[in-house]
């Protein structure tokens, strides 16, 4: 029985740490009463081994074993570099 590896796509909002990035994942949630769809954001800390990401990059991350107190995701690839 194999587990499915969780992957997420999001935008880098911080790259100030060494070998770490903060990725914002946006999702649409329906309001329980009014029925309107609302954007909700989740911030995840991810491991960036080569410090190749910059702020604003669109990236794919995957879940891994805990690397620190808050970091349990790692960078898979950069989908789109931010325009400088």
Curated annotation (Swiss-Prot):
Q: Fetch the PROSITE patterns from UniProt.
A: RIBOSOMAL_S17
- GO cellular component terms? cytosolic small ribosomal subunit
InterPro entries hit by this protein: NA-bd_OB-fold, Ribosomal_uS17, Ribosomal_uS17_bact/chlr, Ribosomal_uS17_CS
Biological process terms in GO annotation: translation
The transmembrane residues are none
Gene3D superfamilies (alphabetical): Nucleic acid-binding proteins (2.40.50.140)
Which UniProt keywords are listed? Ribonucleoprotein, Ribosomal protein, RNA-binding, rRNA-binding
The reply to whether rRNA-binding figures as a keyword in the UniProt entry is: yes
Task: State one molecular function term (GO).
Answer: rRNA binding
Alphabetized Pfam families for the sequence:
Ribosomal_S17
In terms of superkingdom, the source organism counts as Bacteria
Q: Signal peptide span per the entry?
A: none
What NCBIfam families does UniProt report for this protein, alphabetically?
Answer: PRK05610.1 (NF004123), uS17_bact (TIGR03635)
Instruction: Spell out the family assignment given in the record's similarity comment.
Output: Belongs to the universal ribosomal protein uS17 family.
* SUBUNIT field: Part of the 30S ribosomal subunit.
Protein name per its UniProtKB record:
Small ribosomal subunit protein uS17
UniProt source species: Aliivibrio salmonicida (strain LFI1238)
């Amino acid at each position: 029985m194999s587990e499915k590896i969780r992957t997420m796509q999001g935008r880098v909002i911080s790259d100030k740490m060494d070998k770490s990035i903060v990725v914002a994942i946006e999702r649409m949630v329906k309001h329980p009463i009014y029925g309107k769809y609302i954007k909700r954001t989740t911030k995840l800390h991810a491991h960036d081994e080569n410090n190749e990401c910059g702020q604003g990059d669109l990236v794919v991350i995957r879940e891994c074993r805990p690397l620190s107190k808050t970091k349990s995701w790692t960078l898979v690839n950069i989908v789109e570099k931010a325009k400088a």
